[in-house]
Amino acid sequence: MVLDPAHGGTDTGARGTAGIRESEVVLGFAAQVRHALESQGFQVVQTRLADENPSFDDRSALANAQSGAVFVTLHVSSSGLPGTARVYVNSDLPMGRESNGLIPWDRAQAPFLGLSHKFGDMVQGNLAQKFKGSPGSAQTCPIRQLRTTAAPAIAVEISSVTVTDRAALDRMAPGIADAITRGAAAFRPSYVVASQSGALR
């Protein structure tokens, strides 16, 4: 599992009027998600562990270097419904290959979109059970970070920076961590089968 706390460094991401900063919140959430995943036997790599801002390409390159990994990027919404959580999968990408048969960097996600949808739906189903008002299935959106990731990849958008109670936002972390971990565990057999069948080549 490659876990990506979005933004960082001078890029704070979304900011709320109560001083909530997306980059700071997701770093804390990532620690709890990582603990939950590792407790279930997953190996976890994070794109950042401190207040720094790796580039989109650096984050994708880290994910693409991990064999058999899945990728989860964590965000806090700028205007979403407080107390809910939403999973996004990248919008459809044209498959396309270069003349040498290789898939272009900016379409690396294309072969994995079906698996990304499956993984996203599994995580979203768990989130919907924990957070009232959350959708029942993953949604699609053009997401720069996911486009160059050659692995099943989802974005998890948490609540909203518009909330005024940071403690209430932080209390969502265990539920987010559990939903991602349960979704990853349920998805793993499908990914193993797809990898072994050669469907991703």
Q: What are the roles of these predicted feature ranges?
A:
Residues A6:
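Extracellular repeat turn/loop positions enriched in glycine and acidic/polar residues, especially those
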Residues T10-A14, T164-D165:
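Short, solvent-exposed loop/turn elements at domain surfaces
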Residues G13-G28:
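Glycine- and acidic-residue-enriched helix-capping/strand-helix junction motifs
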